[in-house]
Amino acid sequence: MQQETSTPAAAVPSNATPAISVRDVTVHYGSVLALDGASLEIAPGRVCGLVGMNGSGKSTLFKTIMGQTRPDSGTVAVNGDDPAVARRTGVLGYVPQREAVDWDFPVSVRDVVMMGRYGQLGFTRRPRRVDIEAVDHALERVELTDYASRQIGQLSGGQRKRAFVARCIAQGARIMLLDEPFAGVDKRSEATMTRLFRELADGGATVFVSTHDLPALPELADEAMLLNRHVLMHGSPKDVLQPDNLAAAFGLDVMKR
């Protein structure tokens, strides 16, 4: 196992339960080592940007936090609970990469957002007024009210991502994992989501975002995390995004471009 050289983020009160806690997690896919003793904590009310090259383990880390991938060793807690509990109770929400979604599926934007309410529907499984209002509110927050009846695949890349963010909001998720939400999005969607993530964090939610957009990190995130199978560094974007740290995460060739 490689030695972790992470720098702690802002201090968390000793009695506060971390929103996300990962301890010495190792994951293999067959003979391929995806995570090697990864450890991290993210406090409630923070936006954290996850940075690493392709194959560094970002998606595996998210899947492990979601409980979709079982680690070979180590522990994961979400709001102090098992990830499965956090998902079942709606505490944990997830926005997948665009490649993971069938955009031709015959479902409207409103239907996608309503999926966030499924765990809270009553015995009849029919949306109640409270569910409809939650969906309306979520659509308004991501500026998609006028697109609610459109088939999801008819939206632009940025609008699609905003629809899945709205699903998390309608769900009432307090911890959100977003896998490359800014990949292939328009400037309006990027600005809308950046503003929204800050509003959600100011309201006590935790937003964990993987991104390749390094220049945008200081505006987007309270803290940044460099990953290369384990956490290389975790702290403020200014401290983390230093040339030596990025060289360790991406390799010297990247830094020379």
Q: What residue spans do the PLM features occupy?
A:
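Conserved ABC transporter NBD signature motif
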Residues: 74-88
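Conserved ABC ATPase "signature" region
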Residues: 114, 128-147
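Catalytic Walker B motif of ABC-type/P-loop ATPase nucleotide-binding domains
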Residues: 176-180
